[in-house]
């Protein structure tokens, strides 16, 4: 279903009429803002109307699952995109946050039946996060 000359291997998708939430983690917000901008560009390419996009922010990646589950339970959205960045430090904190964010996001979609996308970068350095969050 790829058009001739298209660089995308995705089938033709149309998000018209879908209500999509983007939940971003404020920690490392300069990187998460790049991810948000990319998500908005992608939704625009899929014909999701600006008025059908709900944006919300939480303190960090650890809080994404609770916000996603609460929002999914309202029935006001068809899908949720969770965005965050966790950069490895010198303590095990990185592992705890990454593991619980991933598990919690998965649990939120399984509990509610609403798709919840895991858009959390888990990287070793800020430069890796910047490289992975820019336009592409």
Which role does the model predict for each range below?
Residues 24, 82-86, 115-122:
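Short beta-strand segments
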């Amino acid at each position: 279903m790829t058009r001739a000359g298209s660089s995308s291997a995705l089938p033709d998708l149309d998000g018209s009429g879908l209500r999509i939430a983007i939940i971003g983690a404020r920690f490392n917000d300069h990187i998460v803002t790049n991810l948000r901008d990319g998500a908005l560009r992608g939704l625009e390419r899929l014909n999701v109307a600006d008025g059908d996009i709900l944006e919300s922010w939480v303190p960090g990646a650890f809080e994404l699952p609770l916000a996603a589950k609460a929002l999914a339970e309202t029935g006001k959205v068809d899908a949720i995109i969770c965005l965050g960045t966790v950069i490895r430090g010198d303590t095990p904190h990185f592992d705890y946050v990454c593991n619980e964010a991933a598990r919690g996001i998965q649990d939120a979609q399984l509990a509610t039946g609403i798709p919840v996308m895991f858009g959390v970068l888990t990287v070793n350095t800020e430069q890796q996060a910047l490289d992975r969050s820019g336009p592409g």
